[in-house]
Amino acid sequence: MKRISSFDTGLYAGRVIAFLFLCCPLRADAISPNEWRFRQTLEVGQGGLVRFSLPAETLDAARPNLEDVRVIDSAGREVPYIIDRPLPQPESAVRPKEFHAQIEGTMTRLNLVTGTKAALRAISLEAPGGGEFTKPVRVEGSQDGQSWRPLAEHEPVFRMPGGASNLRISIPDGAWAFLRLTIDDSRSAPVPFTGAELNTGALSAPTEPMAVSIKSRDENPGVTRLSLNLGAMNLTPASVHLDTPEPLFARTVTVAVPQIGEGDITEKILTSTVIYRMDVGGKTESRLDIAIDRPVEARELVLLIANGDSPPLTTTGIRAERRAVYVMFSSAQAGRYALLMGNSQCAAPNYDLSALAQDLKGAQSNAAQPAGIERNPDYKAADALATVSLTGATIDVAPWGFRKSVKMTGPGTQAVELDLDILARATHDLGDLRLVCDGRQIPFLLEKTSISRPIPMAQSVANDPKKPNISRWSLTLPKAGLPICRIVCTPGPGVFQREFHLSETVTDGVREDFPIALGTTTWRQTPHQKPRDIVLELNPGPTTDRLILETDNGDNPPIELNNFRAYYPVTRAIFRASPVSGAPTWLYYGDGDASVPRYDVSLVATELLRSERLVASTGPEEVLKATIVGDTLTGASLYLFWGVLGLVVVGLLLVVARFVPKAA
C-alpha cells in the first residue's frame, strides 16, 4: 500500500477546498432571515475551510437534527456546510481461541489464548449462578507465553446483593497473543469462571464539558430518582459522573429520558450500568462514570439509583460531558458570517456535499468561535406552541361531580401534579379530567413519572380468634380508589420467614361481599442481615379504603409490623396557559361516563415536553352535585350505612303499623 505523506495530505485537502469553491459556490438563492428566530455572528479570520464546534445554546435553539441551521455570509447569501458528529466506534466482542481455568492454592488462574491480532481493551468474564462474591484480579499479557507484562492490578470483579455486578476488567489498549488472569481467593471461596469475551478497542470521539445540575431528588422504596437539568436540548451526553463521599458501595444506575407516548409522557430507558467504590486487596477501586452516548431531545435526564436494602447513596455533585458537534464550510474570504437557527417549518438543506464529508473531516481547517446567541428582531413566523390554540371546544360541566382551581405563577407551559382528591375521584384511566377556562377546555398531556409518593396508613390488629396461627392487620387508606402501587412496613426484631397476603373486600351490585387478592410476597429476616422494610407490590390496585394483610405464623411466635405506608405514582397534567386571560382555570373530575379527551396538542407534544415548565398547584375541592351516599362509601362505612338504613326502615314500619286500624 502506498504511504501518504503529510505533503500529499495537505495537497489533497487543498484540492478538496478548491473543488468546493468550483462546484459548490456561495449560493445566491433567496433566503429570508426573518423566518429564523435566532442568529449568531461568526468572525472568520481568513479564507479557506472553517470548522467550529456548535455551543450548547445553539443546539438548544435548533431543531433536534439541525435541519434548520443555515450559514450566511455578510451579503446574506446562503453558504453550503457539513455537519460532523464524531461518535465513538462501538466495541466488538470475540471469544478467545482457548480458555483454561485452574485453582492453585489460594488463587484461581485463567489462561487465555486470544486468537486475534486486534487491539484489546477489556476482558469480560462469565460466572454462572447467582452467588455473591468480590475478587481482586491481576491481568498480564504476553506475545510468546513466556515473558509476561502486567496490564492491570487489583481490578475488582463482583456480584453483590440486589443484582449489582461487574465482571469486566479494563486493560490498556493493545494486541496480545496470551492473557493470564490471577484471581485472589484468600478471603472467600473460589468462583467457577467458565468463559470470557475479549472486547476489542473502540475509537474514541471528542467531548466537551456540559453544564448539568440536579433539579430534583425523590426517594422511592429501594430507589433514588435524580432528575438532571442538562441546561439545553438536543445534546448527546457522553457520560455522567457522580460525586459521593460514600467509602464503600455498589449501585446499579438506570438512565431514562421523558418520551411522548399515546397522548401522554412516559419515561424511556436508555441504558443501565454499575457504579462502585470498594476495597479490593487493601486498595480502593472506584468507577463513578455512567456512559450514555445517546441523543437526548429534552432538557431532562433521569437517573434511577437502585439502593436495594442499603440507605440512599449520598451525592455531593455531578459532572457531565457531551459529544461535540462541528460545522464545516468553505469561506471565500475573511469576514463576518452568521448562523441562523430556530425555524420549525423549513426543510433540511441539500447541498450535495455528502460525497466529500469524509474527506473534509480530515482536511486542515481554520478555527472559529460563534458569538453569543441573539434573538432575530425581524422574526415573524410563530412558534409551534403559539400556533396551537390555547383553548379547545366548549364544555358543559354539569355531569362532573368535582372541581379544583388551578393556581399559576405566570403564563407559559405549566405542570400541575394530581393530588389524592383527584386521583381518588377520577376514573382509573384519568379519562374524565378536564382543564377549563372561561367555559372552554384547555388541551393538556398527562406525564406519568417514575416518582412515587408515600401515604401513611392507619393500622390495627384484626386477628381472628378461630385462626390463632394467622396474624392479620387492618390497614386504612385516607380515601378509597387511590392508585396504590405498593405497601411498605417495618418489621420488628427477630428471625423469620413469612409469606404475606394482601386483600380487600368489595361489594357487588347486590351488596354481597367477596375478597380480592391484591398482592403477595415472601420475606426473610436472618441473624446476619440488617433489618429491612417489607415491600409488597400491588396488582391490581385497591378500590376500597380498607385492606387486610395476613400471614401464617405456623408454630412460630407472631411478628410485629409497624409504620405502614402506601405509595402511589406521581402523574402531572402539562398544558400551556394564556398570557392574557384573567379568567380562573379549573380542573374538573368525577364523571364516570366521560371518555378520554382528544386534543390537537398531541401535534406539538414534543414542544411541550422540551419547553421550560412552571409549577402550578390546585386549590380545595369543590363538590358540584349531590351523590348517592351509599355509592360513595366503602368497607366498614358501607356496612354501617346499610345497617343504620335498615334500622330506620324497621322503625318507620313500626310507627306506620301503630296508625293502621286494627281489624274488628
Give, region by region, the residue ranges found by the protein language model.
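Bacterial N-terminal signal peptides
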Residues: 14-25
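General helical structural elements
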Residues: 6-7, 19, 662
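Extended non-catalytic domains of envelope/secretory-pathway proteins
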Residues: 31-664
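N-terminal secretory signal peptides that target proteins for export/translocation
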Residues: 1-12
